[in-house]
């Protein structure tokens, strides 16, 4: 009985995320993401217009979402891997 209880505790610890962590995409590839540091609990996707048909996209974690401008479109979100 003790072995079963210990096994359940270990499985619970392994399967559950014991701390709050946000996971955000940080590359254009959909399967590559990083765990955000403490305090950065939002995901961001910034599209920077360089030339009429060329764009840079930056993805990652952020604490405060900046405002968009004429040359930069900013999208912030609050769920895991939401910055596609």
UniProtKB/Swiss-Prot annotation:
The record's subcellular location field reads: Secreted
Keywords in alphabetical order, please.
Answer: Cardiotoxin, Disulfide bond, G-protein coupled receptor impairing toxin, Secreted, Signal, Toxin
Concerning InterPro entries, the annotation shows: Cytotoxin_Cobra (IPR003572), Snake_3FTx (IPR003571), Snake_toxin-like_sf (IPR045860), Snake_toxin_con_site (IPR018354), Toxin_cobra-type (IPR054131)
Cleaved signal peptide residues: 1-21
Give the matching SUPFAM superfamilies. Snake toxin-like
Spell out the disulfide connections: 24-43, 36-61, 65-76, 77-82
Q: Gene3D superfamilies, alphabetically?
A: CD59
Question: What GO CC terms are in its UniProt record?
Answer: extracellular region
Asked if the keyword Translocase belongs to this entry, the reply reads: no
Q: Which GO terms describe its molecular function?
A: toxin activity
Tissue specificity as recorded in UniProt: Expressed by the venom gland.
CDD domains, A to Z: TFP_snake_toxin (cd00206)
Q: Where would you say this protein principally sits, based on its record?
A: secreted
Q: What else is known?
A: Negative results: does not affect blood coagulation and does not show significant hemolytic activity.
Q: Which family does it belong to?
A: Belongs to the three-finger toxin family. Short-chain subfamily. Aminergic toxin sub-subfamily.
What's this protein's function?
Answer: Acts as a beta-blocker by binding to beta-1 and beta-2 adrenergic receptors (ADRB1 and ADRB2). It dose-dependently decreases the heart rate (bradycardia), whereas conventional cardiotoxins increases it. At 100 mg/kg, intraperitoneal injection into mice provokes labored breathing, impaired locomotion, lack of response to external stimuli, and death (after 30 minutes).
Protein's name in the database: Beta-cardiotoxin CTX9
Give the species: Ophiophagus hannah (King cobra)
- Upper classification of the organism: Eukaryota, Metazoa, Chordata, Craniata, Vertebrata
């Amino acid at each position: 009985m003790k072995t079963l209880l210990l096994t359940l505790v270990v499985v619970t610890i392994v399967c559950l995320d014991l701390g709050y962590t946000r996971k955000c995409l940080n590359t254009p590839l959909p399967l590559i993401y990083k765990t955000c540091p403490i305090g950065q609990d939002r995901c961001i996707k910034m599209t920077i217009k360089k030339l009429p048909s060329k764009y840079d996209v930056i993805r990652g974690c952020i604490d405060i979402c900046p405002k968009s401008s004429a040359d930069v479109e900013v999208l912030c979100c609050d769920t895991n891997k939401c910055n596609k």
